[in-house]
């Protein structure tokens, strides 16, 4: 949360707009590093196999591993797009192009970003 406050203060100082995005579907795309099993959800129980459990292939919203899987997927994407990870805060990503700067702050499934030039935000 402190990193977000710093970004807001920096954006105000630099005079650039901030944008916010909520990426709920990102939780459904994160890969899991370990095997995770869940019990049958209410209303979907198999009467013949009441104790059957399911192994998840992807992260599921509400799963304790979901935020980390989400962050790792988003981080890989941003690094492939030439962003640099923040040295002090690894949830901040920077993209410099000549005299322009784009800053992205990732907080669980929320993204706050702003730039010295609006065309970088597009």
Name each model feature, range by range.
Residues 1-122:
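Long, low-complexity, charge-biased intrinsically disordered regions
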